[in-house]
Structures are given as C-alpha cells and as structure tokens.
Amino acid sequence: MKQKLLLVALLAAFGLLAMAAPRVETISSPNGNIRIEVSIGNQLQYSVYNGDELVLKNNVLTLQMRNERFGDKPQLKGCKRSRIDEVIRPVVPMKYAVVPNKANQMSLTFKGGIGVDFRAYDNGIAYRFNINKGKKKVDVLDEGVELNFPAPFMAHISKTDTYAMSCEKPYTHISTSELQEGDQMTYLPILFESPRGTKVLFSESDVRDYPHIFLTPNGKNGFTSIFPKSPETWEPSGDRGWKITKERDCIAAQIDGRRSLPWRFAVIGDDATIAGNQMEVVLAGPCEIDDVSWIKPGQVNWDWWNHWTVWGVDFETGINNDTYKYIIDVASKFGVEYILLDEGWNKSVKDPFTTRDEINVQELVDYGRQKGVGVWLWLSWLTVEHHMDLIPYYAKMGVKGLKIDFMDHSNQWMVNYYERIVRECAKYKLMVDFHGAFKPSGLEQRLPNLLSYEGVLGLEQCAGCEPKNSIWLPFMRNAVGAMDFTPGAMQNAQPEDNWGTGSLPMGGGTRAYQMALYVCFESGLQMLADSPTRYLREAECTEFIASVPTTWDDTRILAAKAGDYYVVAKRKGEQWFIGAITGERKQPLDLTISLDFLTKPGQLTYFQDGRNAHRIAVDYKKGEQAVTPQTKLQLHLVRNGGWCGVVK
C-alpha cells in the first residue's frame, strides 16, 4: 500500500513539473550557426548560441505600460515562422551598394495584444516588441532589456553618469565580472568579447518616437536597460541648451497603440564580421523620400578646427567673405564638393538671419556655384527649433545643407526632433549633418538627406583624440552607421608630442594614418579639418584624400583585430581603395595582404609611414607599383600609423 501511495505521489510530482516546464521555441539562422532559444514560462526569456558556444544566457524581456505589465507568466497565443530574403539598396551606401537581408524570423503573439519578433541572421540576432492595442494611445513606462553572459566577458563601453551628453566619451575596457550594480551606465553601441574570442556588438535600429536605450551593470555578469524619461515641459538654456523642467513618469508617452518598438540587435562573430556588418541598415525602415536625386554625399572643407588659419594671402583672414572665397578656391582646386561655415558666421547664435558684417551668405553661395562648390551652414539645434522658417529661407538662397549641433540628449522628445527637422529639410532639398548627436539608429536610412552624425570622440577633441581609442571605432561606433569623425590633420604628431592649440591644432597619429582614415572611416559627409593653406602645401596628400569617395559599392575586410589594427579595401566603380590603421603598440605592425579581390591588373599608388614616423609623425613615403589579383602586399605600420592606396 505504501509503495502504491509513493508511486502515485511521484507521478503527481512529475505531472506538476511537466505542467510547470516552460515552453521552448527555437529558431536558427539560414546557415544554422546562430540559434535563438526562447523560453516561455513564468517569464519570457531568450538565449543565443554561436555554434556550440552560449553567448547570451536567459535574457528576460518585459514591457511595462500604464496599468499593464507584460512578461509575468505570458500566455502564448501563436508562433509563426517566416523567412526574410530581400536586398536593400541604400541611397547613401556606407559599405555596400546592395545589402542582402536574409534571416529566419519567429513571431510570437501573446494574450493582451503584445508580440515579439525574433530574427536569426548568419551574423547575429535581433528582436523587437509589437504592440497591438488598437486605436488608443499607449504610455510605455519601461522596457526591460537584459544582456546576461554565461561567463565573464570583456566589455568595451563608454561610461556616463548623465543622459545629457554628446556621446563623445573614450572607451573603457573591463571584464563584466568587475562591474558592480550602481556603476555608471553606458550608451550604445557596446562591444563584448567571450573567453573564446567571439565578439558581440549590441545596438538598436528603427528607433521612432521612442528614446535611445542605455545600459547599466546588474552586478551579475551582465547589464540591464535604463531609459531617459520623456520630457513634459522644458525651457531654453542659453543659445544652445535646454532645461527639462518636468519629466513624465514614462519613457515614451502617447505612442501609437498599434506599432513596433525599436529593434535590439547583436552582431556575433569575429572581428571582421563585426566591422563589416550592416545590421543597423537592414533593420531600419525603407527610404521615405521619392526623389533622392538631389541628395549628394561628399567631402567638405571645415573651418572651425583650423580656426580659419590661412596665410600667404593679401587679406586679413578670419570669419569673412575673403577667407571663405579662398576656402572655396582650394576646395574647387582639389574637387572637394562643399565648404562649411561653422559657428561664428552670424552675429548671434540665436538669430540665423543676421550675419556678421563681414559675411554675405548669398555672395558665397553664388561664388561657390561658379566654382562647383556648395555651401553648408552651422546652426544650434535650439535656433532651428525657434526659427523653422530658416529652412526654406536658406534653401531658396542655394545653401546645400545644415550642420545642426548641441542636441546632447536622446529622450523621446529629442528623437522626434531629429526626425521632424530632417523631414522639414527634405521638403526643401536640404541635407543634414548632426553634431552633439547620438548614434545612427535607422533615421538616415528612411530619410537619407541625413548624411551623418557625430556621436564620437573625434579629431575635434585635438590631443584628446588618440589613435589608441580611435582604433576601436571600426568595430563599435562606425559599425552601426555614418560617423562624422572630422579627420584630415596635416600637422601630425605622436600622442606624446601633440601640443596643438586651438588656433594651431595637431592631429594624433602619423600622416599616413590621417590619410588612411578617409578609407577606413565612413560618413556621407566627410570633413577635411585642416587649414586650406596646409592642404595646398601638402598637395600630393590632399589629392589622394580628395579622391576618396564617401559612398561605396563593395567592402572587404582584409585584416582586423579590434583595438589593434584594421585593414579594409573598398570599391567605387572600378577603383579599389585600401586603408590600414593601427593604434598605440609596442612594436611596428607587419602584415601580408592578398589582393585576390581584384578582377584585373592595375596600378597601385600608395602612402605609407616613413622610416622615422614612429617619432616624427609627419614622415611619410609615396610609392607606386603594378599589381595583379595574385599580388601579396607587404604593409608596415609604425605605432599609431597608417597605410593607404588606390588601385586604378
């Protein structure tokens, strides 16, 4: 009798366990290497495998709306699997003219009008929430995003203790095991490395009417999400800032009740996979501008960094028409498409219509038109917000684009500001470049008159911009979209010798390094930061820089090690450009690079570090050689060095 009772008890226990066991749904990438396991039980959580390696473990997903929370014992209604197989042709292609979008998708629907899409790509994963609440508006109080790792991973992050910042922090490199709950938060993108060396790049795309995500350590070998609240009221602060006077209790207020939230994505693979990915592109929405023929990416001579410093002329240089006509002349000589009038061209930052006495914008636009050079204007975001009529005013004058600066926030209101301004500029065929900005997150794909974003510790910071930090950019910031780094210093120095001042700036790294940045870094609007006079005196270097396209048909990552070196080849038409950079290292870098991507023989013109560039950074050597698809190039880079060339 006791045995029978024991048997009954055991059967009942196993039955309860079976009832309590979570349901697991799995989806794999087209090549089968990436696998997502979604567990639906008391919580909704997912894990990710790269082959047999677990890279993300039990990440819990929640969504807190007003008077409703999703994620506690979610009740699955349906599971639909589909295949994504399409090609995307970006209007402003940063790496590829044709981008394949191939993935397997699993769409889960739950009771309560909530769904989650999961996508498995050959090079990573993505997911997003779907809300189906009908016509009513929804307040999102919080979205729960987790990144949990099965072991200590190296984290490469940008720490911040405030949401009000321009995303220009240096990278910190630390094990997840050393991070404690309550430590500073980090903004995206963020890069992780597993004990096996697998890289995981985390970011987001298709962010609309919603804040950007920040992450904070959870003290358990991982991160959890944290978002800026949605502003309810604010007031101006000075000529370029704002003070949020009242915040709502939610991160996203009054959003459509039938919509998708942003894609969260993780690119997974080796260093080359990370640097070559197009995840932000394929997850963004399609282009929303019918006629894009007027959108012309290009290079621009920039005035602010070199402090309007030109010499050997018969006029007083500064912020005046004579200086800008000189800049236009130099731009025209080298085939640079644009010049920029940065801060200082108007009498007051607050007044976009009254120029200083020495500036006549219409005269400069007309002069530039004769020379084949377009004009861009710098403006504070606050000025644009208060004077939206400046957009048709300067468009009618013939200005080509606006550099809009100092947003320094990524809450719901500011995300909407970006889109509102870019849409308004598109109506009048004006292009846009955002400085003091957050990272790309899809808007530039939908509205491609947005050519670039800053959101990077770039050359603007002079000695604060060191190659040891910048060598991470192809694997982090520039791996998620256009990056206005503002390269091009001709006064070059190794970091210990970088004594540049505001009026006589210097650039860290060798001359060949600064030149190679034009091939290695990607931006629809690429600055030439140094003095036009220096570019004239360094004409053979300038001729190469000005020949580098800002958009590309194809990209090949030839050699890559995050934090150490990056070598890339990019094709425009029938020409291949090759760029290589390295950071601070104890020994020179020697690499053998195959040119097997060539389809026919050609002539290579190249620039490399000079014999003494490890000490005297301006030292470089120019060379030429015949090459074929069988050629093996020998690259030699000094510390903080570079190599660049073009095959014609």
Where are these regions (language model features)?
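N-terminal accessory beta-strand-rich subdomains and adjacent acidic, glycine-rich linkers
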Residues: 22-282
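Catalytic cores of secreted or luminal carbohydrate-active enzymes
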Residues: 512, 516-558
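Edge strands and adjacent loops of beta-rich recognition modules
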Residues: 94-100, 544-568
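Bacterial N-terminal signal peptides
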Residues: 8-15
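Aromatic- and carboxylate-enriched substrate-binding clefts and catalytic-loop regions
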Residues: 341-510
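C-terminal beta-strand-rich structural cap/linker in extracellular carbohydrate-active enzymes
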Residues: 624-648
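An acidic-aromatic substrate-binding cleft motif
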Residues: 252, 256-330, 334
